[in-house]
Amino acid sequence: MALLQISEPGMAPAPHQRRLAVGIDLGTTNSLVAAVRNSVPEVLPDDAGRVLLPSVVRYLENGGRRIGHDAKAQAATDPRNTIVSVKRFMGRGKAEVEGAANAPYEFVDAPGMVQIRTVDGVKSPVEVSAEILATLRQRAEDTLGDELVGAVITVPAYFDDAQRQATKDAARLAGLNVLRLLNEPTAAAIAYGLDNAAEGLYAVYDLGGGTFDLSILKLTKGVFEVLAAGGDSALGGDDFDHALFDHVLAQAGLDAKTLAPEDVRLLLDRVRVLKEALSSAPEAALDVTLSNGAHLAQTISHDTFATLVEPLVQRTLTPTRKALRDAQVTPADIKGVVLVGGATRMPVIREAVAKYFGQPPLVNLDPDQVVALGAAIQADLLAGNRGSGDDWLLLDVIPLSLGVETMGGLVEKIIPRNSTIPIARAQEFTTFKDGQTAMAIHVVQGERELVADCRSLARFELRGIPPMTAGAARIRVTYQVDADGLLSVFAREQHSGVEASVVVKPSYGLADDDIAKMLEDSFKTAEVDMRARALREAQVEAERMIEATQAALAADGELLDAVERAEIDARVAALRTIAQGDDADAIEAATKALADGTDEFAARRMDKSIKRALSGRRLDEI
């Protein structure tokens, strides 16, 4: 009798069983959707044959809305109700975005993420992004002829937990099942790696409309391993537009604050066209009339533009150096540099990348499309449509360390930065005081040694710990980061089994430069941080020793004569005074002096306990 053959899950070859999944590049300036068709990834066009969907949503008074090209065409005439570059606001609070360069919107002060007032009511960045995602979903279903089982949506590698969660929420609102949030540079590497069968060390330089990412990847026989990631979640092509915008106004003697919102949007649109023209011409002309009758006519050379944006170009190289340092490689070790994002079409970017890495960048895939193509490949795999050439493994990383606060305001790192995800790490902690029945778990993110210098992500409490002496309880704290880069934390007391957990969902994310600043500060202040940590550890141990000694004196002080008691009291007082200073060595010495001075007392207490335990018992009972 022949054995029945059962396919591995997801390996069924029948074409009618193929599950439809797409990759979506939710961009700051433009968004795209791609799918694998006939084993080849391709970007899906709209009815007019356009693959790029401008990431623009216009809200109308009657509750209607315009999305994409139609909305973009009206941005200059109705700027307050036409939301552009909404990705910059994802996971951000009002205080973080109110200074957004030349933004014509009325921001609303609401709990958590920023809100924008429109004629159709107050809208959140999640709602605006959902409109864009829903449009792409509809395009995909119309093109592919069926409903989608899910989507892989790309995000900047440097998006923090709040920004990632906001992206998932937008997808859910758009009716999309998120198979995975995939880092944009990694998606690009998938597209390049599978297309070219590449191996070796690669850098992915991703400059989009609103974000910058630099990832170092190692490609080896189908394994995509991210060695390090860096970036700036508030740097992109929009900033180059604003630099040129400010220059044009300065030349005309105008102030942006005095312009009507529609003039700001009109001028930004014209400046963007000017910037794009300078990518292929030595100079370009600007000719525009504002609503107040002011006429601006200027000619800008490429050299002038290059000078204006040089500080922005250098800002991309700072995280590039950090990522190389984290990966422990040099520019000479890099086999190829992949350019991603429409902003990398600028000659100033390509020249800077070529100069830094000592080689021309790879540009054989469209930088606007490469991320969506890689996401489509990953989506097809996650949907179960595996083929013979799909035996590859993706290993992504987290950009910043995750830790927990311990006594004295110290940070104990649980998962270090650039750890491969998904990942789970656990560590055991204990109680500080006798009879302690609860423990506060404070989850932090950053590279510094003190909690005050790191970003607070979440707090929760583990209650119901059985009363025990200090140090007897065993609390196991587990950090778990899923494949989307989202964090969950679990705490469990090992003896009783009592447990608590939290899914980290901060109300909004890190400020524009916080992540880069965290890393930069950690490098600059490493020695100072370690000294501060040593001091706090010494102070915590001194406090523990004082409390333990005082508890022992209260319980068994009669075991000491007056001279012995006075000596111990003197050492306790000395330690308490010294512990208030900033000399860790002196504190450790005073702590040791108290420990040495109470050795005999501890021995007498032990004898007393043994005698009490044996009192009234026969020898054969022992």
UniProtKB/Swiss-Prot annotation:
It holds the Pfam family HSP70. Belongs to the heat shock protein 70 family. This is Chaperone protein HscA homolog. Chaperone involved in the maturation of iron-sulfur cluster-containing proteins. Has a low intrinsic ATPase activity which is markedly stimulated by HscB. One of its GO terms (biological process) is iron-sulfur cluster assembly. Keywords: ATP-binding, Chaperone, Nucleotide-binding. NCBIfam families: HscA, PRK05183.1. GO terms for molecular function: ATP binding; ATP hydrolysis activity; ATP-dependent protein folding chaperone; unfolded protein binding. The gene is hscA. CDD domains: ASKHA_NBD_HSP70_HscA (cd10236). It comes from the Bacteria.
